[in-house]
Amino acid sequence: MNKYVLSIALLVASTGAFAQNRLVKKAQGLINNNQIEEAQTLLTEALNSGETKDMALAWDVQGDLYQRLFADELNKAAAHQPLDTAKFAKNLYACLDAYEKCNEYDEKKEYAEKNKGNLMKFRTFLMYVGQFDFQNQNFTGAYKAYDAWLTYPQNHKLVADEPKVLNDSVFDKNQVAYYACLAAYQGKDFDKVATHLEEALKYDKEAKTVRQLHLMTLLEK
């Protein structure tokens, strides 16, 4: 009798896991058809049910969905149309987090190559967020973006050892550190002015400004 009950329990559990995995596959199809809201509903259920077996796939698809959303905003900019900078930033951060979670579950490294390529490209977009937010005087958001760019190798394991990430040829790390210090000061988040101070002081063009920011921060705290 106990063996029979156990068999039924295992059957029910496996059926539930299979159903949740089907939700993820269905969500993939919906994303391809640009039915984003419907896809998100299915993914939310799959990610929170506790029954989904292939969590790496679920988080990979979730990352793809967020990528679709922030890419839509970039396409607007390319077409010289107004873009929602807050929506762009929100979905970029969410996409990065989703791919990182995928990597944590991806024991067989099925998605590593794909997501590594994405992460290599997406770092630049953090600079867009920083620029958008600074121009809109959202200094907290600007600091977050610059800090995320600077700490990218530490926070994204798939690209942590990539030479192009460790030594970015597009943006000067010391210049980005200066932007971070400036955003923190403008946002009156004085403790964060010192976070990237050492690197910012190496940006010779604005080293004097950085020292002044540091001094004013000490006086205003």
What are these regions (language model features)?
Residues 1-29:
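Bacterial Sec-dependent N-terminal signal peptides
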Residues 20-78, 83-87:
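Start-of-domain marker
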Residues 23, 59, 66, 126, ...:
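TPR repeat positional signature
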Residues 45-48, 104, 151, 198-202:
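Conserved structural position within tetratricopeptide repeats
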Residues 51-53, 107, 154, 205:
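Short coil turns that delineate tetratricopeptide repeat
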Residues 65-180, 191:
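Short coil/linker segments at helix-helix boundaries
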